[in-house]
Amino acid sequence: MLLGVNIDHIAVLRQARMVNDPDLLEAAFIVARHGDQITLHVREDRRHAQDFDLENIIKFCKSPVNLECALNDEILNLALKLKPHRVTLVPEKREELTTEGGLCLNHAKLKQSIEKLQNANIEVSLFINPSLEDIEKSKILKAQFIELHTGHYANLHNALFSNISHTAFALKELDQDKKTLQAQFEKELQNLELCAKKGLELGLKVAAGHGLNYKNVKPVVKIKEICELNIGQSIVARSVFTGLQNAILEMKELIKR
């Protein structure tokens, strides 16, 4: 299984003081040596990664670069100019802390944007909710890749197996008894497996990501139809204590098949 390391949160730390420390390019070099892919989300508001980050990483790093971006003309034109290995189209809201759900596949610009990117020899992935309907739509749209949103799975795992319910970060909608949460967790994991199988049946390559960490990743790794995971925040958080290289290698060991 391949590991794409999302380095957005290193850019968040840099932007907190508006200095070039930590250096995002240095982080990209470490990912290039120890991971399989560099993933970077250039948001419309440029709250963390900047255009020059993408340009420098593509220019100086040999690893594949996976650009996450919304259906924004300015950023799509940047992608067409710089030509990352892959563009993963994601939904985006300015007020959100992180991507809250999968892409709406009924967007009028979506088909045209996919065609433009593919005509420039850029692989296209769609970040979608794990639903059979969205997978079938992704095939119709002729995407080569899909990335299944694992946020709900991760939230359920947290509610079941961590102390988050006793903290300020508890989710009200998951304030339920353990038996109910366990049933929901098992159902969501089965749904991820069903969707991954459907994607592969339709000839799509299947990735997964969002909220995955060192404690919840193993059940997802067992879904053999998923070929790649994109993980960021948990690796960067771990790197505060272990260093980025070790944090990546620890995750690589966990996802080894």
UniProtKB/Swiss-Prot annotation:
The keyword Cytoplasm applies. The keyword Chloroplast does not apply. CDD domains: PNPsynthase (cd00003). The record marks 147 as: Transition state stabilizer. One of its GO terms (molecular function) is pyridoxine 5'-phosphate synthase activity. GO terms for biological process: pyridoxine biosynthetic process. It holds the Pfam family PdxJ. Belongs to the PNP synthase family. Catalyzes the complicated ring closure reaction between the two acyclic compounds 1-deoxy-D-xylulose-5-phosphate (DXP) and 3-amino-2-oxopropyl phosphate (1-amino-acetone-3-phosphate or AAP) to form pyridoxine 5'-phosphate (PNP) and inorganic phosphate. This is Pyridoxine 5'-phosphate synthase. The lineage of its organism: Bacteria, Pseudomonadati, Campylobacterota, Epsilonproteobacteria, Campylobacterales. The gene is pdxJ.
